[in-house]
Amino acid sequence: MNHADYGPIGLLVIQATSLCNLDCSYCYLPDRQKRRIFDLKQLPVLLDRVVESPFWGPHLSILWHAGEPLTLPCSFYDEASAIVREQTAELQEQGVQIEQHVQTNATLINDGWCECFKRNRIVVGVSVDGPEEIHDTHRRFRNGKGSHALTMRGIQKLQDHGIPIHAIAVLTGAAMEDPERMYSFFRDNGIHDLGFNVEEQEGVNASSSMQGISREKQYHNFLKCFWECNQRDGFPIRLREFDQITEMMIGGKRLLQNEMNRPYSILSVDSAGNFSTFDPELLSVETQKYGLFNLGNIRDQSLVAATQSETFQQLLQDMTAGTALCRDQCDYYGFCGGGTGSNKYWEHGTLASSETCACRFSTQIPVKVLLEQIEAQGVKTP
């Protein structure tokens, strides 16, 4: 494999801070109680590392994520945005599109944050798991108090300011019990762009409430009901799981790889400047088999030089082997492009593996549900 098989970098994930003001029961991050902050003096260095490499492409999304980004002040993102504009001016003149995104629990959003998002053109993603008792079962402050009320207050602020949002809901066993209520919650609260992340066995979250054949059947029925409710109302909600599959089906497209297993499609950087590629959930994770997944630090290692490291070569070898297994063994390969390394590692102990519980939830079951709907009703898709 040569550098032509790497990139382009479409997503740059930066951990602004390791600290999170919540203590969600299913979180995979081990150090979310520690306040480690990304020094913005590192940002020009990081952007230079991207630009000097052969891996940059026509579009770059910078995502502030991992920890709660809004535990830092608005001024942090004002300064970061100014640096991004200055450092990428030449690229933008060449037609490269640069965007900033933030993924937040929304509990800290007020008018000041909304103004910050608007003046810096930051796209906002919100984490909300559904109705209060479902959300608050897992998404709590460290004092045990639920976060739902403050999350919904933050969402309302965004809507009052006319800021579009997309939402991610982590689905746990409790959410499976009433799909119509889950659907109505998002519809009635004006959340029209939604993705489901099924609770995963990952990082310090050593088990999941969504494991087992019975849960897979339940999720199948959940998605079927969600689709039918959405169709009944004229598809007010764009559900990521169906959108991606529908686009591929209608266009006759299939994936050969995905950004989670292609080197330098994603670049992830922690608060200390350590970087990795492939799946962002692998960043700064220490394991018995691979050691740290990190490839180096932006201060003293270029992206190209990192590809010569023993760590990169081992990760690439096993990731490639795992992707090949998926391609050879799985009928759904064209819809997922070989799965995600973090799920393979946490479920099988190696990247050189194939089917996971996570891929059955994220790809196989949505494909089955959508095919059933098409066969039963004809192609009536949003």
Each PLM stretch: what is its role?
Residues 6-41:
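Canonical Radical SAM [4Fe-4S] cluster-binding loop centered on the CxxxCxxC motif
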